[in-house]
Amino acid sequence: MSSPPQAVASLTERIKTLLESNFCQIIVKGELSNVSLQPSGHLYFGIKDSQAFLNGAFFHFKSKYYDRKPKDGDAVIIHGKLAVYAPRGQYQIVAHALVYAGEGDLLQKFEETKRRLTAEGYFATEKKKPLPFAPQCIGVITSPTGAVIQDILRVLSRRARNYKILVYPVTVQGNSAAHEISKAIEVMNAENLADVLIIARGGGSIEDLWAFNEEILVKAIHASTIPIVSAVGHETDYTLCDFASDVRAPTPSAAAEIVCKSSEEQVQVFEGYLRHLLSHSRQLLTSKKQQLLPWRRFLDRAEFYTTAQQQLDSIEIAIQKGVQGKIHESKQRYDNISRWLQGDLVSRMTCRLQSLKKMLSQALSHKALSLQVRCHQLKKSLTYPRQIQQASQKLSPWRQQLDTLISRRLHYQKEEYFHKHTRLKHAHNVLEQQLRSHVQKLELLGRRLSRGCELNLQNQKIAYANVKETLATILERRYENSVARYSALKEQLHSLNPKNVLKRGYAMLFDFNENSAMISVDSLQENARVRIQLQDGEAILTVTNIEICKLIKG
């Protein structure tokens, strides 16, 4: 069975899918034909050889290749992809790069040299030097007669105040250009003539800019101790000089903007950084004060020593009172014991003597045996002084023990006082060491803060320069696109003006009554009045013979 019929759109879509998926990256070589550059910037063309023809389109061509306009007969190499234009059922090449014949060999040589020098380390990012912040002398290596040096001088006069510029004249195109530029770089470095160098040249083809792809120039830039800014060609032009230099600028004017900032902007930037630094410092100091507030009473040495001295005095007074109290208490106990012992003995002796008196008075009438007995008893009673002596001997060890106890207690309290004094002295030393440590930490934080602010300042300056460079590039590109679009619209409007046709000898015919344009003989009538407009005025005519007009028409 045969397949069902397909819609034209469905078949075209299948063909489009097959072509665009299988021919997404192609390179075509041929001759341009039917070249048409539209005011929108799109390029429509045909590319052919002796046996075939292929339509093509290059969208936004003018924004990428504004320095050269292609024409019929140019031999080119086109990079792009196949696409199908469904409304016409045609396939075409949609280009994204166009290389003129002869430039392909140079591009191949460019890529080979770039790969080799990259492997040798000539384009390494870590070897690039930073630009000076406010250069006093700016060296410019360029042609002294071109518009480039005028652009640089104009920007510097507007953006900077105190500076010197040293122009080293060289040729920027031709066989000797690379050697002259290399020699200029060597002389500038040997004599230390500038703080920063600008290598500048206007736009051109790859052949015109080839001097800046020479290996001798790349090596001279790499060996330079002075920072170099490359400003060669337009923004879309890249040379090996751009990769080897420390900074690439899209245009010579942008290079002047990069190497020299205006004094007013520098003051504003510094004031902003100063305000930020002061605000950050105040916040940091406030935070540190809050953290150190609990340690304030320890850092006040006078208050600390006063409190410690009061504590020592209180301890000493307490010790003295305690010792005196113990001594007084011991003396009272000793006196009480002595009074008790003495009072009891006297009362007993008094009673006994009275009893003896009674016994002696009765002994006169008793017998000698009783007297002897009584005498024996009297002898016994006379042994009490010996007991007193024994009691005194027994009290002597107690007195010695009491004295020893008091001395030992005093010794212990003195040692305790000495230990407390030692601990307080140790605590004072520890607090003093902590104070020194905190002071050192504060000094370290201050140094870190200073280094951090300097680093932040440098980063902010670099970011500001990058943003400014990008903004200037975007504005310049938009301005150029707007000028090109305005010129194209102006030309288109001028070409559509009907009055321009009248200048070439033509006339416009209008109906006299209705004032409408008459474009056919059929609208004419005999003896009718018509109005004719010429280049420099109008006239009223009467139709006399229509056949003649028809004969002319035929």
Swiss-Prot record:
It is an enzyme of class 3 (hydrolase). It catalyses: Exonucleolytic cleavage in either 5'- to 3'- or 3'- to 5'-direction to yield nucleoside 5'-phosphates. GO terms for cellular component: cytoplasm; exodeoxyribonuclease VII complex. Its EC number is 3.1.11.6. Keywords: Cytoplasm, Exonuclease, Hydrolase, Nuclease. InterPro entries: Exonuc_VII_L, Exonuc_VII_lsu_C, OB-fold_nuc-bd_dom. GO terms for biological process: DNA catabolic process. One of its GO terms (molecular function) is exodeoxyribonuclease VII activity. The keyword Iron does not apply. Pfam families: Exonuc_VII_L (PF02601), tRNA_anti_2 (PF13742). The keyword GTP-binding does not apply. CDD domains: ExoVII_LU_OBF. PANTHER family: EXODEOXYRIBONUCLEASE 7 LARGE SUBUNIT. Heterooligomer composed of large and small subunits. Bidirectionally degrades single-stranded DNA into large acid-insoluble oligonucleotides, which are then degraded further into small acid-soluble oligonucleotides. Belongs to the XseA family. This is Exodeoxyribonuclease 7 large subunit. It comes from Chlamydia pneumoniae.
